[in-house]
Amino acid sequence: MPLFTLPFLGMIELEIAPKYWHLKAPHVELPSCSQDTLLSTLYSFDLYLEVPLSSDEREVLALLSSARPEFTAVEASLFRLSVWRAITTIPLGETASYQALAQTIGNPRALQAVGTAVGANPFVWVVPCHRVVRADGRLGNFALGSTLKASLLLWERRVLALR
């Protein structure tokens, strides 16, 4: 199985099966996905971090695809789009609560709907929903697992400290 390294996850193992691809990382929950989803995620992750992929990562991508995948169109309500847009305004290394997002979009009573919209975010690396936390500061849920959410926030703070 191909191995490569991501900045904050360490060594990653890629398991390739007929109907799914799965990234295995120590102490991190990563869901199985299609080849296109995996490649889109890795490429958008590269853009999101503004850090070039390592030679190992590029080698894996070269094995998987000869061309950069296209993002598929996503249908979403205006409400969800407004939540996702608001998430993109949360600065690197900072967090905002679901309540703050609801207020930002002008619908302060829509906490549950905001949470649903955050959870439905199909662009995890582009719309940084890992920056959304509970009002009491606890991390809350994350599509790729709470360990990865904590790692992303810690990594962002370290990046800021280096600037």
Predicted features along the sequence, with ranges:
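Short, proline-centered helix/strand-breaking motifs
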Residues: 91, 122-128
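Basic nucleic-acid-binding alpha-helical/helix-turn surface characteristic of O6-alkylguanine DNA
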Residues: 1-108, 159-163
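Residue-level signal for inorganic ion chemistry
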Residues: 87, 101, 129-130, 152
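Pre-recognition alpha-helix immediately N-terminal to the DNA-recognition helix
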Residues: 82-86, 113, 151
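…primarily DNA-binding HTH/wHTH and HhH modules…
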Residues: 135-163
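Regulatory, non-catalytic segments
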Residues: 109-124
